UniProtKB/Swiss-Prot annotation:
Name of this protein: Protein TIC 214
Function: Involved in protein precursor import into chloroplasts. May be part of an intermediate translocation complex acting as a protein-conducting channel at the inner envelope.
GO terms, biological process: protein transport
Compartments, record wording: Plastid, Chloroplast inner membrane
Keyword Cell cycle: no
Subunit-level organization: Part of the Tic complex.
Classification lineage: Eukaryota, Viridiplantae, Streptophyta, Mesostigmatophyceae, Mesostigmatales
Membrane topology (UniProt): Multi-pass membrane protein
GO CC terms, sorted: chloroplast inner membrane
Transmembrane segments: 22-42, 61-81, 87-107, 131-151, 161-181, 210-230
Organism from which the protein derives: Mesostigma viride
Keywords: Chloroplast, Membrane, Plastid, Plastid inner membrane, Protein transport, Transmembrane, Transmembrane helix, Transport
Length: 410
């Protein structure tokens, strides 16, 4: 659909003119109405087996549901969309089970059951059934969203007219295809000697199997991570009022990708456990593994975590690398950690609460010595709170100690 809409024979200037949002919405809705998804097959089955009122109401539920999802996108209701993102994995599973149950019910019950206009309760159930299926099925909602938001040169100047055109296109074309198939089956009945029962049985079986195949394929292919085209940074306000970018398209690939990455990283940092998620209670063994991998190079300089050289051992003298010492002392080794952002935010938040208080990792030289980092009996890092002046004084004392070591070796 995306390639088809981009290859339309009329220029973008016509599509982008102030007099064409309704026409353009009608064209897009017509293309969406021809898509084959679970909702369209269920509506077609209801039209043939349960009668015209049931089929029309089912198509109406699909059209309203797809238009409502586009309404949330185009008018910037990002808060609702974020909640939909959060519920999408569970929602997809529930909708998939509901669709499978509905389709299996169609296969088991192939009798003709006409629903009349007086049966308002049954019609309402049919309407809600298709509306929920389409809204919760990524194959339907994402197909509509990716088609509309991938069009170049259209600025959605009048969203209401555009959405009305989309709704009419989806509903009219969907019903038109259903009535066309119904007319062809009627013509086939007249021309052949088959009984009406055999027609109902075969039509129900074919449509139900096709719907089940589409459901399985969409469940395998679509998942919540495919929604990378949605710009989560858009403010909750109608797009018609946004003039900062001089009516550019709804989003660009770079903008949407960056927005999604920020959202994804936020969710991952919130939900996934990290070995260095807290500054206190960090096992020495984990820190030692990280320290050996990220700080010590192929030509290791034996330093403890405070940036001081180790003492001589029986294997020989160890020459300290003072650039590495300086980097460790300035806490630059945090930048090599995969949890650098989390630790940095944690430290900044602590400083912002009380600028006169900082968190500092205090440990013994033996605990942080590389020779003992793999020892399971090593103690854990503890956190002590000190004032900012004491912390600065401690740094000055450390500089002086390093300078004294350099002077003694020289």
């Amino acid at each position: 659909m995306n390639y088809l809409i981009s290859s339309l024979p009329f220029p973008n200037n016509f599509l982008n003119s102030s007099h064409s949002p309704f026409v353009f919405g009608l064209i897009c809705g017509s293309l969406l109405g021809t898509s084959m998804n679970v909702g369209s097959f269920i509506s077609l089955r209801r039209l043939i087996i349960q009668g015209i009122p049931a089929g029309v109401v089912s198509y109406l539920g699909s059209a309203i549901s797809e238009t409502f999802f586009l309404f949330l996108i185009l008018f910037g209701y990002i808060g609702v969309i974020e909640k939909w993102f959060t519920l999408e994995p569970s929602l997809t599973f529930i909708i998939t089970v509901f669709c499978a149950d509905t389709i299996i019910g169609f296969l088991l019950d192939n009798r003709l059951k006409i629903v009349s206009l007086s049966q308002t309760t049954d019609l309402l159930k049919i309407f809600l059934c298709n509306a929920v299926i389409v809204f919760g099925n990524p194959g339907s909602t994402w197909g509509a969203t990716s088609l509309i938001t991938s069009i170049e040169g259209f600025q959605f100047r009048e969203n209401s007219l555009f959405l009305f055109g989309v709704f009419l296109g989806i509903f009219v074309i969907g019903c038109g295809i259903g009535f066309l198939i119904l007319a062809l089956t009627n013509l086939w009945m007249i021309q052949s000697s088959k009984t009406f029962r055999s027609l109902i049985y075969r039509s129900n079986k074919i449509i139900s199997h096709l719907a089940l195949c589409i459901l399985i394929l969409s469940t395998i292919y679509y998942h919540w991570q495919v929604y990378i085209g949605l710009s989560l940074s858009t403010s909750s306000m109608p797009m018609i009022t946004i003039t900062k970018h001089d009516r550019e398209p709804f989003y660009t690939d770079d903008e949407s990708q960056m927005s999604w990455n920020r959202y994804k990283n936020k969710v991952e940092r919130k939900n996934q456990p990290h070995p260095m998620k807290t500054l206190g209670g960090l096992p020495i063994k984990q820190f030692g593994q990280w320290f050996k991998k990220n700080v010590i190079t192929s030509n290791p300089e034996d330093l403890d975590a405070r940036g001081l050289p180790r003492e001589r051992t029986k294997t020989g003298d160890y020459v300290p690398n003072y650039e590495t010492m300086q980097a460790i002392r300035n806490k630059k080794w945090f930048s090599r950690s995969k949890n650098y952002l989390y630790i940095k935010e944690k430290i900044f938040s602590l400083l912002s609460i009380n600028p006169m208080k900082v968190k500092f990792l205090e440990h013994s030289r033996r605990d942080m010595d590389l020779f003992y980092l793999g020892d399971k009996k090593s103690t854990r890092i503890t956190i002590t709170e000190m004032s900012k002046s004491d912390y600065n004084q401690m740094l000055e004392n450390r500089k002086q100690r390093i300078q004294n070591i350099i002077n003694r070796r020289n």
